[in-house]
C-alpha cells in the first residue's frame, strides 16, 4: 500500500461510513458547527505526515483524530474563516501505529464578490513559452535505485511536467475517497470562491510522493512528507515539479535523503514542502 495513500484507507466513504472503530463523532462536529455558523466551505492547506511502516495485505486499519488547534478568525483571498489543525493517529486492528499526521484545513465563508467573479472566470493553460517550461526535456526517469554515495547536498532532481486535467482532478478525488463536491462540481467550487473544480490535497500528496519516489527508485521508502498548498491546481493548467537534495543521513538501519520540492503552475506555487526517503541500500 503506497504510504501517500495512507489517509484514504480510513476516510468516510460515499455513504458517510467510517473505518470500523475509527473516530466517528467529535472532532468532526467542529466542522459541522462551523458550517451552521456560516463557514461552510473547506479546503485542506497543509500536511505533515510520518510513515512508520508499510501496510500489508489483510491488515485492517483505523484512525483516532483530535483537534489540536483552531486559529483566530482570519481573512484570506478565499474569504473569512478559521484554520483548524487535527492530529491523526493511524493504527492497525492490534493498536500498532503505522503513521501519524498533522493536517490543517481552512473552514471559511467564501467572499461574495470572489464567488461572483469566479462564475465568469476560466483557468488559463500554461503557454509553451512559459519560463516554467523552458529547459525541460522529454527524458523519463529510469526508476533505478539511487545509492547515497552518489548523492550530494544541492543535487537537483529532474523537472517533471504534470498536465492538470479534469480527469486527473475528478479521478484523483474519487480514487482517494474524497467526495467533496468542489472537486467535481464547477458551480459548487465557484460558490466556494474558486474559479473551477480544483485538485484535492490527497491527489497532490500522491503526485509529490510519486515525484520523489520515482527519482529515488522503486525500492526506496517514503518516511516523512510535509507540504503546504497555495495556488490551486485547475483544469487546463500544468504543474512543473522541481526538487533539491537538502540533507543526507547515514543511520544503522537506513540511508536517508531529504528532498525539498515545489510544484508550480500558471497561477504560482501550488505546493512547497519536503520529503525524507530511506534508500534501498540497507534493509
Task: Report each predicted region and the residues it spans.
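Hot-dog-fold acyl-thioester-processing enzymes
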Residues: 1-46, 112-221
Amino acid at each position: 500500500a503506497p504510504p501517500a495513500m495512507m489517509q484514504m484507507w480510513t476516510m468516510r466513504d460515499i455513504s458517510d461510513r467510517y473505518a470500523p472503530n475509527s473516530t466517528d463523532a467529535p472532532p468532526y462536529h467542529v466542522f459541522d458547527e462551523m458550517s451552521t455558523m456560516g463557514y461552510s466551505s473547506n479546503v485542506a492547506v497543509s500536511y505533515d505526515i510520518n510513515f512508520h511502516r508499510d501496510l500489508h495485505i489483510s491488515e485492517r486499519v483505523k484512525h483516532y483524530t483530535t483537534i489540536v488547534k483552531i486559529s483566530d478568525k482570519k481573512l484570506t483571498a478565499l474569504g473569512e474563516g478559521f484554520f483548524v489543525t487535527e492530529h491523526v493517529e493511524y493504527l492497525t486492528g492490534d493498536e500498532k501505529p503505522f503513521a501519524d499526521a498533522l493536517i490543517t484545513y481552512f473552514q471559511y465563508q467564501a467572499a461574495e464578490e470572489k464567488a461572483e467573479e469566479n462564475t465568469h472566470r476560466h483557468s488559463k493553460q500554461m503557454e509553451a513559452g512559459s519560463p516554467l517550461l523552458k529547459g525541460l526535456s522529454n527524458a523519463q526517469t529510469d526508476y533505478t535505485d539511487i545509492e547515497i554515495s552518489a548523492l550530494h547536498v544541492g543535487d537537483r532532481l529532474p523537472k517533471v511536467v504534470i498536465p492538470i486535467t479534469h480527469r486527473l482532478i475528478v479521478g484523483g478525488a474519487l480514487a482517494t475517497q474524497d467526495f467533496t463536491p468542489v472537486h467535481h462540481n464547477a458551480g459548487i467550487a465557484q460558490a466556494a470562491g474558486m474559479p473551477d473544480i480544483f485538485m484535492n490535497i490527497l491527489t497532490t500528496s500522491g503526485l509529490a510522493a510519486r515525484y520523489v519516489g520515482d527519482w529515488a527508485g522503486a525500492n526506496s521508502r517514503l518516511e516523512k512528507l510535509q507540504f503546504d498548498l497555495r495556488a490551486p491546481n485547475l483544469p487546463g493548467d500544468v504543474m512543473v515539479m522541481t526538487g533539491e537534495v537538502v540533507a543526507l543521513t547515514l543511520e544503522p538501519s537506513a540511508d536517508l535523503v531529504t528532498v525539498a520540492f515545489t510544484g508550480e503552475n500558471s497561477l504560482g506555487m501550488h505546493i512547497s514542502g519536503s520529503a525524507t526517503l530511506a534508500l534501498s541500500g540497507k534493509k
